[in-house]
Curated annotation (Swiss-Prot):
Function: Component of the Mediator complex, a coactivator involved in the regulated transcription of nearly all RNA polymerase II-dependent genes. Mediator functions as a bridge to convey information from gene-specific regulatory proteins to the basal RNA polymerase II transcription machinery. Mediator is recruited to promoters by direct interactions with regulatory proteins and serves as a scaffold for the assembly of a functional preinitiation complex with RNA polymerase II and the general transcription factors.
Compositional bias segments (type: Basic and acidic residues): 24-47, 234-247
GO BP terms in the entry: regulation of transcription by RNA polymerase II
UniProt keyword list: Activator, Nucleus, Transcription, Transcription regulation
Sample GO molecular function, one term: transcription coregulator activity
Protein name per the record: Mediator of RNA polymerase II transcription subunit 7
Family the entry assigns: Belongs to the Mediator complex subunit 7 family.
Residue numbers spanned by region Disordered: 1-57, 101-122, 222-247
Organism: Aspergillus niger (strain ATCC MYA-4892 / CBS 513.88 / FGSC A1513)
InterPro entries tied to this protein: Med7/Med21-like, Mediatior_Med7, Mediatior_Med7_sf
Pfam families, alphabetized: Med7
Length: 263
């Protein structure tokens, strides 16, 4: 009776929380904090600030009602239940043969069986080719299924099983193709990032050329001003104009820098 109630609980659409939540009371939490402070005392007898890991908490001498407050160790093997269905902890995709389903495509490329040397690398499976074949088989089997229903509907089970097997094989092939799809997506993202970086480098080179031209012009104006140090009024006026042009060129450099940085 208890097992049946537990199965109903696991299979409900919105499963209730596990019963251990009842132990998360303010008193139990306070007792756990006191035990942690007591265990973290140093040689001077004063508690030290410490970030406790679940493994360290499990190593403490805790009463049974407080042990439920400590996170359990994360399992790396075995199964877990989701709405009454067992799920494997392993992320590896099980083969159709392991699941007791007939596999309609080869496990490796047919060219691998004709290899002369076993040291040669195996060729990847042509997923698109076999997906297309399975899609055509689905259409053909569906037409046959409709024909069976029109002639002798009581013999539909075999065709339904064939359609089910074809759909499972197509779905499994798509799952096998996902790692390749992830690699292609990563390659595309890296190429976009590389193109953006090259564009930024080109903009920086262009800005560098503009600033270099302005600095060379300033240097030429400075050399020309130092080569004619006359003290006449006309030269003083020219020197004032040169100084004004130097200020304008310097302002141009800052405007260029501000514009590129803001852009």
């Amino acid at each position: 009776m208890a097992d049946a109630a537990q199965q109903r609980t696991l299979a409900t659409a919105f499963a209730p929380p596990p019963p251990l939540w009842k132990h998360f009371t303010p008193d139990n939490l306070k007792r756990l904090e006191e035990i942690k402070k007591e265990a973290s005392k140093g040689e001077d007898g004063k508690p030290q600030k410490k970030k406790w890991s679940p493994a360290e908490l499990r190593a403490l001498d805790l009463p049974p009602e407080l042990r439920l407050l400590v996170p359990p160790a994360i399992p790396d093997t075995g199964h877990y239940s989701v709405f009454g269905e067992l799920q494997n902890l392993s992320t590896a995709l099980p083969s159709l043969k392991d699941q007791g389903i007939t596999q309609l495509y080869p496990s490796s490329s047919p060219a691998d069986t004709d290899r002369q040397s076993p040291s040669e690398p195996s060729r990847p499976l042509n997923h698109a080719y076999y997906l297309l074949k399975i899609s055509k088989s689905l259409l053909l089997n569906f037409l046959e299924f409709v024909g069976v229903l029109s002639v002798s509907p009581e013999q539909f089970e075999s065709k339904v099983e064939d359609l089910r097997n074809l759909f499972i094989n197509a779905h499994h092939l798509l799952n096998l193709y996902r790692p390749h799809q992830a690699r292609e997506s990563l390659i595309m993202m890296m190429e976009e990032q590389l193109s953006r970086t090259k564009e930024e480098i080109q903009q920086m080179d262009k800005l560098k050329a503009e600033i270099t031209g302005v600095l060379e012009r300033l240097e030429a104006d400075g050399i020309a001003a130092q080569s004619h140090p006359q003290q006449t009024d006309e030269d003083g006026r020219k020197e004032s104009e040169t100084s004004q042009k130097t200020i304008e060129d310097a302002q141009l450099v800052w405007d260029l820098l501000d514009g590129k940085i803001e852009g």
